[in-house]
Amino acid sequence: PVGSIEVALTPERLNYLVRRTEFAASWGFSAEMLSPEECANLNPLLDPTTFIGGFHTTGEGIGKALRGAQAQGERAQSNGATFIGNTTVTGIETVGSKVTGVRTATGVIPADLVVIAAGGWGSSIASTAGVTLPLVSMEHQYAVTEPVSVLAKGRDGDASVPFVRIYEAGTYVRDEGDKAGIGSFNHRALPVSDSDMVNNAANLEDPSKLPFTQVDWDQAWVETLEVMPVLSGLKYEQAYNGVFPYSADGFPLMGPAPSVDGLWILECLWATHSIGAARSLAQAICGIAPDIDFAPADLTRFDDAELVPADFAQRCDNAYIDTYAIHHPAEPSTSPRGVRMSPFYDEQENLGAAFFDTSAWERPRWFESNAGLLAGLNVPARDAWSSKFWSPIAGAEHLKTREIAGIFDMTSLRRINVTGRDAAKFLNYAAARNVARGTGAVTYTMLLDHNGGIVSDVTISQLAEDRFFIGGNSPRDVVWLKSISAGYDVQIEDVTNGTTCIAVWGPQAREILAPITDTDLTNDTFKYFNAKETSVAGVAVTAVRVSYVGELGWELACNASAGSQLWNAVMAQANRVGAVPAGRSALTSLRLEKGYRAWGSDMSREDTPTSAGLDFAVRTDGEHLGLAAASARATTRRLRTLSLTDIETVPTIGQPIFMSGKNVGYITSAEFGWSVGHPVALGWLPAEINEGEVVQISCGGTTVNAVVAPDAVFDPTGSRIRV
């Protein structure tokens, strides 16, 4: 390794690089900020007068992809693998929904398990099995100069000085012996179609090297020379447009193809991912819980609505162009938008909803119609970074929910029906506690993998002896349930797209719903963690008495066709009592005050119920998948609630936690707790750190103190939710 330097030309970039040093600390990597002079001392190509600082890490290096592939190939052969070289793959053979082989120019190779790891050709190969991969191959410019006077002569092409990224120029520069190699993202997206990829493979000696387009290079080169003027006047010994695939969100595509049994995907990888990604996928194929949860890269994160070629092609273009952009964790997509909307989207838009998108769903963060609630509200000053994509209106919605009620759009969450003769037996096995407890019973629990890791946290409502309704998190929940259902007479149906869900939460939730339903909502008749199929405002709903904000209330799920009718009826009653529509920002601050976890940001398959603080949601009352394995795992870290003492600093995801100067963990979620008057966060800490101890959080170069708190800093007994 030779290390790397990322230079900042603007104060905004410099602040972002400071945060990158913090993220590096969270993941155990050594990184530091350097002055321009210190950067130039490490890499003589840099002119220290042209930039204002740099991020430096020593662990980065140049990956030799061919050497790596050769070494892995030799190891595989020594373990019995056979390679068939110079063979054109023309498709995947299937019978029904099962893979049966690989079709080549010389015949069919029988196989009941196939992994597509074909780089830019992966999309066209997958399409022969009826699988759409949201990826597009992109041209990427690269040039190598003639020898540079300040670089060491006579080297064999290996790097000897740190790799440099010049984000504002959209370029990176490395030394290739005594020459400079420059790559550029500073150009328009140049997608290569699947058909062109196939034609290039047939007609070009190296189909991953296309002709250099000078018009796309000139601006990037000018901006690079501003930081490295020593390269001025040099000619290029090589210049070409390379080709590699980009996914719709810039992350890899891994995991089983949902529609074809035995077909697995390993695409959109860079050399840095290769061995780790291959190991994780191999573990998953063998039925072993991967050491590293690849949920952010799991193919199933893309729902069917996100697999429209024109839409994901646009997202792939954006992902390429934004490779070197400053990314904020709360930043919404720019395009395409409006792909998936709740049935009452127009009504929300009329209320001034500030929308963001998740899995292509439009979700309101807050409502401008609530701006009048800011009068008299004490809003603490907030740091610039956490103020992005945020509004104090969210605080007003939070407080109004605690005072009266909030109406929340929960449409984007996963809704699953599980039915059949073995439905109860199957779910008792799949869940970490018995869920077949009688019609009307609602159970909060987890789905665990074979290693005891948390696949998802779910609420399971028993609607009949053989019929259950699950509130889940993502399409992955459905794929997981189906993958472990062999041998059970059970049907698993994702009903998210044809349904919607509205949550009514707050002290006056009963006053809102009682006038528009004949169902008795009193506590004696409709208890907490109970469900009923009933009617609200003439709409057939599944009413589930649960709450993600720690207040009395119900989630109302119904057919999407009746969603607008239900929303309008609920909002009419909400207006009558002074309740308000509320967005996801308020939901986050409300749940954090209660210590409620969010799967995906706070916990993953790498965590157990014990480490995540969810032991209360499991029971050793039967044979539950993964529970014994979870119990056998040592608990070395725990997810803890943190109360911050600095009311003006709200951490963001991934920022490091220190104790006595040592990095001990990182933040998973944070928001200002409007009911308690200070920021509240969840973060991972060593198991031996106890409640009441003080830690420090590094937030954009500022260090703030936080106290390890009880899980719930608001209404710790849960009395408000059970009235």
Indicate where each model-derived feature is located.
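C-terminal catalytic lobe of FAD-dependent flavoproteins
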Residues: E168, S193-S195, N203-R340
